[in-house]
């Protein structure tokens, strides 16, 4: 993946500097590494700004809620997924007329689909099951949004969507929705502070990948 490729590039650069330990080579490769660092910092700064400014875009019309899936462990939501579900529970209680798509397929190490896990969690908390629709085929953020929108059209639900996911994930989700010509808003779930750095760095690579490919 793109994270591994970036790591290989940095490692290769360090190896070349050490191997060609002559003044000229050292100067050339030092400039290469410096240029790489400057570009990397520019990318990180831009992505950080975009993430921070797209965390919450409050709906201005009736929408369908779309909750993006995350890892399931032993048929239970992971911490990140639980954060999304708790925000969903709060938002659905505050807006009792809204319908909700729970989007997420079943990963290789998951006993049930992410959609089913989310459904069970919200129903156990008291959400009316008739308000919940399961989209259980998606394997990526793009598929989450695309397949959810297809289900929305099939069920004749409001076409504008409110995406609920963790704050670090909202910008990429909103970008994908725009590319699919789907009008979208954002309600972000809080991320535990000890998880945020890891997810944040990984998300930056995800954003770069999204714009390149």
Stretch-by-stretch model annotation:
Residues 1-21:
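Membrane-embedded alpha-helical segments of integral membrane proteins
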Residues 3-5, 29-36:
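Hydrophobic alpha-helical transmembrane segments
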Residues 16-19, 23, 42-52, 208-212:
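Structural signature of transmembrane alpha-helix termini at the membrane-water interface
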Residues 20-32:
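Membrane-interface helix-boundary motifs at transmembrane edges
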Residues 28-30, 45-202:
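A structural signal for short, hydrophobic/glycine-enriched beta-strand patches
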Residues 33-45:
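Hydrophobic membrane-insertion alpha-helices, especially the h-region
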Residues 198-205, 209-212:
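Membrane-interacting alpha-helical segments
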């Amino acid at each position: 993946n793109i994270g591994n490729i970036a790591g290989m590039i940095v490692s290769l650069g360090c190896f070349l500097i050490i191997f060609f330990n002559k003044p000229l080579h050292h100067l050339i490769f030092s400039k290469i590494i410096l240029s790489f660092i400057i570009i990397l910092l520019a990318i990180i700064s831009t992505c950080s700004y975009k993430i921070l400014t797209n965390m919450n875009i409050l709906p201005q019309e009736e929408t369908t809620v779309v909750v993006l899936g995350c890892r399931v462990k032993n048929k239970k939501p992971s911490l990140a997924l639980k954060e999304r579900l708790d925000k969903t529970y709060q938002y659905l209680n505050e807006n009792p007329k809204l319908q909700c798509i729970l989007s997420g397929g079943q990963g290789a190490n998951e006993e049930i689909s992410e959609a089913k896990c989310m459904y069970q969690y919200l129903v156990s908390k008291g959400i009316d099951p008739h308000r919940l629709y399961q989209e259980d085929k998606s394997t990526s953020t793009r598929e989450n949004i695309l397949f959810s929108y297809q289900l929305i059209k099939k069920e004749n639900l409001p076409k504008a969507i409110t995406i609920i996911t963790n704050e670090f994930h909202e910008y990429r989700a909103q970008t994908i929705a725009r590319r699919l010509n789907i009008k979208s808003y954002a309600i972000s779930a809080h991320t535990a502070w000890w998880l945020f750095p890891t997810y944040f760095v990984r998300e930056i690579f995800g954003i770069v990948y999204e714009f390149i490919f």
